[in-house]
């Protein structure tokens, strides 16, 4: 897909369709910073409001995004964390960078 804004809109819609209502979906990395190349991947962060992750979370919540991207010859790198895990990692450079660059999609 040539239009990044349209693709971001589709990501947001898919997030609203597949994620629980209390989940968050963020775009981060080069696509969020506006420094992406045409072949850059899409970095997505899914935050679930659960006590702990379940073995089915990736298939249920992340896989639909990778499938959508593959249909458009794009690559999505989804990361899933619980909100509790995310807070526990707040001191890490990864979390600080994501929090700085993120675009909230859901």
Give short role names for the model-derived ranges.
Residues 1-26, 32-38, 49-106:
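Catalytic core of pol beta-like nucleotidyltransferases
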Residues 42-47:
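Short beta-strand->loop micro-motif that forms the acidic, two-metal-ion catalytic signature
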């Amino acid at each position: 897909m040539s239009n990044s804004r349209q693709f971001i809109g589709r990501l947001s819609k898919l997030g609203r369709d597949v994620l629980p209502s209390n989940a968050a979906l963020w775009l981060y990395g080069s696509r969020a910073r506006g420094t992406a190349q045409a072949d850059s991947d899409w970095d997505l962060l899914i935050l679930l409001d659960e006590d702990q992750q379940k073995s089915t979370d990736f298939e249920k919540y992340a896989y639909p995004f990778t499938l959508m991207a593959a249909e458009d010859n794009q690559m999505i790198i989804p990361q899933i964390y619980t909100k509790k895990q995310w807070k526990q990692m707040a001191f890490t450079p990864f979390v600080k960078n994501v929090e700085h660059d993120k675009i909230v999609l859901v």
